């Protein structure tokens, strides 16, 4: 319920449904004035009127300037115009200019027709030009007032105005306003016409007939000087002679044109379109009558044709100006306010529509990121086909690369390719869900314990189907870490600081265990004062970057994806959930004998899973959950005691290149282990070379990446931990737990964000 007051400031009204109908409908609703229960004064009641004098169901506006303006401004102007017209038309106080003429000019020697014999005399013209439009306007206003008064709540009816204790309804005010402007326009048109006629003194076609010039009184003959300037008229009727000197412009034409145009504008603005022919009929009738009035002055030799045409232009121009600017095109006084409200309403609708869309998207995207446990246990949305994945909506968002796919988008590691420093290409923004997490070890243990307990109840078997050899797309491994908190947008878009990626430049892969000084180097930036986050990338459709020349390979990948996508429909859980559940069933998840609080997670993308009974020294990343001095430490075993502190690629111990990290080989198996976990850290980075069998006496959470030998057909699994021995010290602020997509063509890029070239890894 919206409360609104009248323009006078004292009235109040109730408008129901204003929010649903919009500004225009609410403004057009009539405000009902209610009577107080005690018979007291009603809202909006004027001081000078009693309750009985106030019409019921009407909105009354109080005006202080209505009567003073009418009495002291409008009436004097109208009266002065009438008085001036009287002296110009009915008296000889103002005489026209005496202009010259030629001797025996036949264009000025037309017969003179008496006023009583004229088709439209001047007095008749004044009567018709005044009475016709005035009566038409008053009748039209009366009919309009009656029709609007019978409507419910008086919609479209102007409010009454109380001025000086008198109540003026809309009919009276509109009639007086329109008729008064019409009268003023007639007087103004007549005055302008008379002034022009007196100033020019252009002769009428009958001038020589009524003038009767005496050519003998001239000192020279007409043959010697044909143009005569002197007054040689010998006619007895001076009034007729003076009238013959006022031909330009035609007064009949100006008055008729003004009346016709003025009343036509009234019809166009007032009459509705319910009757398609009534409005044109009335308009054409008045226009034709005005034209006839002007043409009769030509046929009866009262004016020249040019005088009539100019009179039409003058009269029509005056009527057009007064109709548009004096009476506002005959529209209600508050119509301009309605038009302004329409503009405001359109702007309001445009502002509200995006808000509704944003609120809907917020509601759909905020369900999965309410808290940490909700993210960890969030069910993976089922993507039934590639068509469903290509829809960008609140559930699924496809991230396309900003640059076209080309050679600069692909990085190939091979022992046959030379080293090349390719400029980095800005990667597409991924949908990441980030939440704030506590730094204490108790909170981390609690989260991991809850996660394990909830997944132990899931007794679902992991179905892994071996893809066809030669058709699995290559995986692109990219590492990113963020040292600043991110926020999740409406669609789940990742909004945060600019993406900073850890780029690994390709180098020659050695064939032996000797370290290469030119290996790829890694530098990570840690911004001070940043908050710690648990960063869990959301499962999205990754882009497969291919060269324009290798479109056939991409077609093969899509074909293979369509064949194997049906096999993954039954897996509604995230990939990491399924791996943990399967590992629990097979007894893979085991604790260290010296560590009762730690846990080991094994994740492989091959057909079979390999238990962790045989520990490999180079494949374990240890995170100290309860360090000394409250400083989480990352311990990465390394077999080298010295080095440059950079990533170094080493050949496998058995001398086989089966585990070489090569992404551009289509014959590889597409499944690879991508499980990586970063730990929190705020102190100095520490690095130690320890054996994999030696465990820390504190609680350790270990994520192991175990490579498994390929099947009989030669499919191999890419491994990170067994293919290289990395020595890494970093100050991590984010724990990344990537999830796996169901589509085999999807690639998971695990990347560190927020790198810094100033702080590198040391020995």
UniProtKB/Swiss-Prot annotation:
Glycans attached where?
214, 219, 268, 362, 432, 455, 513, 543, 568
Membrane protein topology class? Multi-pass membrane protein
PTM (free text):
O-glycosylated. Probably at Ser-346.
Give yes or no: UniProt keyword Cell membrane.
yes
Q: Composition bias, kind Basic and acidic residues: at what positions?
A: 669-694
Q: In which tissues is it expressed?
A: Expressed by glutamatergic neurons (at protein level).
Tell me the GO molecular function terms.
phosphatidate phosphatase activity
Q: Which residues carry this modification: Phosphoserine?
A: 36, 346, 385, 438, 461, 472, 606
- Which InterPro entries did the record assign? P_Acid_Pase_2/haloperoxi_sf (IPR036938), P_Acid_Pase_2/haloperoxidase (IPR000326), PA_PP_rel (IPR043216)
Region feature Disordered, mapped onto this chain = 33-54, 458-529, 669-698, 739-763
Which keywords fit this entry according to its UniProt record? Answer: Cell membrane, Glycoprotein, Membrane, Phosphoprotein, Postsynaptic cell membrane, Synapse, Transmembrane, Transmembrane helix
Family assignment from sequence similarity: Belongs to the PA-phosphatase related phosphoesterase family.
Instruction: Please state what the protein is called.
Output: Phospholipid phosphatase-related protein type 4
């Amino acid at each position: 319920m919206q409360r609104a007051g009248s323009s006078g400031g004292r009235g109040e009204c109730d408008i129901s449904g204003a929010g649903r109908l919009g500004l225009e409908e609410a403004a057009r609703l009539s405000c009902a004035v209610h009577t107080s229960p005690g018979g007291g004064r009603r809202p909006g009641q004027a001081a000078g009127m009693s309750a009985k004098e106030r019409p019921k169901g009407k909105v009354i506006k109080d005006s202080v300037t209505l009567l003073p303006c009418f009495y002291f401004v409008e009436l004097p102007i109208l009266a002065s115009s009438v008085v001036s017209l009287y002296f110009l038309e009915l008296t000889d106080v103002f005489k026209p200019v005496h202009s010259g003429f030629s001797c025996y000019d036949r264009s000025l020697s037309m017969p003179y027709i008496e006023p009583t014999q004229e088709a439209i005399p001047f007095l008749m013209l004044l009567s018709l030009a005044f009475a016709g439009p005035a009566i038409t306007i008053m009748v039209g206003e009366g009919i309009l007032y009656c029709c609007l008064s019978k409507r419910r709540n008086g919609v479209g009816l102007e409010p009454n105005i109380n001025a000086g204790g008198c109540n003026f309804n809309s009919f009276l005010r509109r009639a007086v306003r329109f008729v008064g402007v019409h009268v003023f326009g007639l007087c103004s048109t007549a005055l302008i016409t008379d002034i022009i006629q007196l100033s020019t003194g252009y002769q009428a076609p009958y001038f020589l007939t009524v003038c009767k010039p005496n050519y003998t009184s001239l000192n020279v003959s007409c043959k010697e000087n044909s143009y005569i300037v002197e007054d040689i008229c010998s006619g007895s009727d001076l009034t007729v002679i003076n009238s013959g000197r006022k031909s330009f412009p035609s007064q009949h034409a100006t008055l008729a044109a003004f009346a016709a145009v003025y009343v036509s504008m009234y019809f166009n603005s007032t009459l509705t379109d319910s009757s398609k022919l009534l409005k044109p009929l009335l308009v054409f009738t008045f226009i034709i009558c005005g034209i006839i009035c002007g043409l009769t002055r030509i046929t009866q030799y009262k004016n020249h044709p040019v005088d009539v045409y100019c009179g039409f232009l003058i009269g029509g121009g005056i009527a057009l100006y007064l109709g548009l600017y004096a009476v506002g095109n005959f529209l209600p006084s508050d119509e301009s306010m309605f038009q302004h409200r329409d503009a405001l309403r359109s702007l309001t609708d445009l502002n509200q529509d995006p808000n509704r869309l944003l609120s809907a998207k917020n509601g759909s995207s905020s369900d999965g990121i309410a808290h940490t446990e909700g993210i960890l246990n969030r069910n993976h949305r089922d993507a039934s086909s590639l068509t469903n994945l290509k829809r960008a909506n609140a559930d699924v968002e496809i991230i396309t690369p900003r640059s076209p796919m080309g050679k600069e988008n692909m990085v190939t590691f091979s022992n046959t390719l030379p080293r090349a420093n390719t400029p980095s290409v800005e990667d597409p923004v991924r949908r990441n869900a980030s939440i704030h997490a506590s730094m204490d070890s108790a909170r981390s243990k609690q989260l991991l314990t809850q996660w394990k307990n909830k997944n132990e109840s899931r007794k679902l078997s992991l179905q892994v189907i071996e893809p066809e050899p030669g058709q699995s797309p290559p995986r692109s491994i990219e590492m990113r870490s963020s040292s600043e908190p991110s926020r999740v947008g409406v669609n789940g878009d990742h909004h945060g600081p600019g993406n900073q990626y850890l780029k690994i430049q390709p180098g020659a892969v050695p064939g032996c265990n000797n370290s290469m000084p030119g290996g790829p180097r890694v530098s990570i930036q840690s911004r001070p004062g940043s908050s710690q986050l648990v960063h869990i990338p959301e499962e999205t459709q990754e882009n497969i970057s291919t060269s324009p020349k290798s479109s056939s390979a991409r077609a093969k990948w899509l074909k293979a994806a369509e064949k194997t996508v049906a096999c993954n429909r039954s897996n509604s859980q995230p990939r990491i959930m399924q791996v943990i559940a399967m590992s629990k069933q097979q007894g893979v998840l085991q604790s260290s004998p010296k560590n009762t609080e730690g846990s080991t997670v094994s994740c492989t993308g091959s057909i079979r899973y390999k238990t962790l009974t045989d520990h490999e020294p180079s494949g374990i990343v240890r995170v100290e959950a309860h360090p000394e001095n409250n400083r989480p430490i990352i311990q990465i075993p390394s077999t080298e005691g010295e080095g440059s502190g950079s990533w170094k690629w080493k050949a496998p111990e058995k001398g086989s290149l089966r585990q070489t990290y090569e992404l551009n080989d289509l014959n590889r198996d597409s499944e690879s282990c991508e499980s990586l976990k970063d730990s929190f850290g705020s102190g100095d980075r520490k690095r130690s070379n320890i054996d994999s069998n030696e465990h820390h006496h504190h609680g350790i959470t270990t994520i192991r990446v175990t490579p498994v030998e390929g099947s009989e057909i030669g499919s191999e699994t890419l491994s990170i931990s067994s293919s290289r021995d990395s020595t890494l010290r970093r100050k991590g602020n984010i724990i990344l737990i990537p999830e796996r997509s169901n589509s085999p063509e999807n690639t998971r890029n695990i990347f560190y964000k927020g790198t810094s070239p100033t702080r590198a890894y040391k020995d």
